[in-house]
């Protein structure tokens, strides 16, 4: 399929996707019943969409195009009520978190969808292992060239986004020692990590043509980069966050990305170059492994900075932009989180350290989601 022209969007508009866990009490393992839930709610959703993701234990909640985080929060809240009621009717529960702490990937059923079945044929067991749960945020752009500039700008802050959203310390019944273990699942995929370097939209079109020669790429949706342009929506999509445990934190993360995008495209503070990515995977690893306690390294100067310190600097820089787009509440909440030094991964570990089981942890996450 050829790459579509870049659809012009109103700059800084938002679209948010949350991949949720469908679990089966009282054992709180992943259920394989997302199709049943989708059928139950599809005629009751008035704004946004509830749909499949890769496997039958995943349920995606997606907003429509939103002006600001308040509109997005309203759509999510309405969807949440409908989904929770349908889940209760079918003796299921819903929760966030980037991984389910003890599910077995071999049990996961890939959705009966042409695209996902084709992906299963291409990637085999890797697709079942990709039963992990992330938050994706789309930001509208006025042109393809703006999208490429924004993608490179946001890529500088991938460690910050990962650390602030880290919520996947447990996997396959084990403490991984990572704050966010979810991104590691994709390391075996050929399109893992950052997009190959291009400097404008014309070069991106040439890149996509080259990738399509592999026959593994049918559309932009088949590319799973950390951040990717989405020409059919006219957006840049940030894909590195774990699904938070609460709607409020998900909305705050979206506000952070929207405000950062506004600052980047309004101020144009960077002259991007390929060398910017020289230490990308090392800095990304620091955020995945240590969360806000990680240390990032400047590829141009060699300077090393605590991620906590650099995140506070980012929040300060984007505060005026956040004020202009109605996202100040998100920046203030994230500032409090950074100062406290906590993320959801640490709260999960604290629960287990206090004697909680992994089954009890999932139950707690369901209670948190339902109560938010």
Swiss-Prot record:
Q: Does the keyword Cell membrane apply?
A: no
Task: Enumerate the Pfam families for this protein.
Answer: GCS2
Q: Which reaction is catalysed here?
A: L-cysteine + L-glutamate + ATP = gamma-L-glutamyl-L-cysteine + ADP + phosphate + H(+)
Report the EC number(s), separated by commas if there are several: 6.3.2.2
Q: Which InterPro entries match?
A: GCL_type2/YbdK_subfam (IPR050141), GCS2 (IPR006336), Gln_synth/guanido_kin_cat_dom (IPR014746), YbdK (IPR011793)
Tell me the Gene Ontology biological-process terms attached to this UniProt entry: modified amino acid biosynthetic process
SUPFAM superfamilies assigned to the protein according to its UniProt record, in alphabetical order = Glutamine synthetase/guanido kinase (SSF55931)
MF (Gene Ontology): ATP binding; glutamate-cysteine ligase activity
Keyword set, alphabetical order: ATP-binding, Ligase, Nucleotide-binding
Query: Quaternary arrangement and interactors, per the entry?
Result: Homodimer.
Function of this protein? Answer: ATP-dependent carboxylate-amine ligase which exhibits weak glutamate--cysteine ligase activity.
Similarity-based family: Belongs to the glutamate--cysteine ligase type 2 family. YbdK subfamily.
Q: What is this protein called?
A: Putative glutamate--cysteine ligase 2
| Organism of origin | Escherichia coli (strain SMS-3-5 / SECEC)
Q: What taxonomic classification does the UniProt entry list for its organism?
A: Bacteria, Pseudomonadati, Pseudomonadota, Gammaproteobacteria, Enterobacterales
Gene expressing this chain: ybdK
């Amino acid at each position: 399929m050829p790459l579509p022209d870049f659809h012009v969007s109103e700059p800084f508009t938002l679209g948010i996707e949350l991949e949720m866990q469908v679990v089966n009490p009282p054992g709180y393992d992943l259920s394989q019943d997302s199709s049943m839930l989708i059928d139950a709610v599809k005629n009751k959703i008035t704004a946004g969409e509830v749909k499949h993701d890769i496997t039958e234990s995943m349920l995606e909640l997606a907003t429509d195009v939103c002006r600001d985080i308040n509109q997005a929060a309203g759509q999510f809240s309405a969807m949440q009520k409908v989904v929770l009621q349908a889940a209760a009717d079918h003796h299921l529960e819903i929760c966030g978190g980037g991984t389910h702490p003890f599910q077995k990937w071999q049990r996961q059923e890939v959705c009966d969808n042409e695209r996902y079945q084709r992906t299963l044929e291409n990637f085999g067991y890797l697709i079942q292992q990709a039963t992990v749960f992330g938050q994706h945020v789309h930001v509208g752009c006025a042109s393809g060239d703006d999208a490429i500039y924004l993608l490179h700008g946001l890529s500088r802050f991938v460690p910050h986004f990962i650390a602030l959203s880290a919520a996947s310390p447990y996997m396959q019944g084990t403490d991984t020692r990572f704050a966010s273990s979810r991104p590691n699942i994709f390391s075996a995929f050929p399109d893992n990590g950052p997009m190959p370097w291009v400097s404008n939209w014309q070069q991106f079109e040439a890149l996509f043509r080259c990738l399509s020669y592999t026959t593994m790429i049918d559309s932009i949706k088949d590319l799973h980069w950390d951040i990717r342009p989405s020409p059919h929506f006219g957006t840049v999509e940030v894909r590195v966050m774990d699904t938070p445990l609460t709607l409020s934190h998900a909305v705050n993360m979206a506000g952070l990305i929207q405000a950062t995008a506004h600052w980047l495209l309004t101020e144009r503070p960077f002259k991007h170059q390929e060398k910017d990515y020289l230490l990308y995977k090392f800095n990304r690893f620091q955020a995945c492994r240590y969360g806000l306690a990680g240390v990032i390294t400047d590829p141009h100067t060699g300077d090393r900075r605590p991620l906590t310190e650099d995140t506070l600097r980012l929040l300060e820089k984007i505060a005026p932009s956040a004020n202009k787009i109605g996202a100040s509440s998100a920046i203030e909440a994230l500032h409090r989180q950074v100062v406290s030094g906590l993320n959801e991964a640490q709260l999960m570990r604290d629960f287990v350290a206090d004697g909680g089981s992994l089954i009890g942890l999932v139950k707690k996450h369901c209670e948190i989601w339902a109560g938010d």
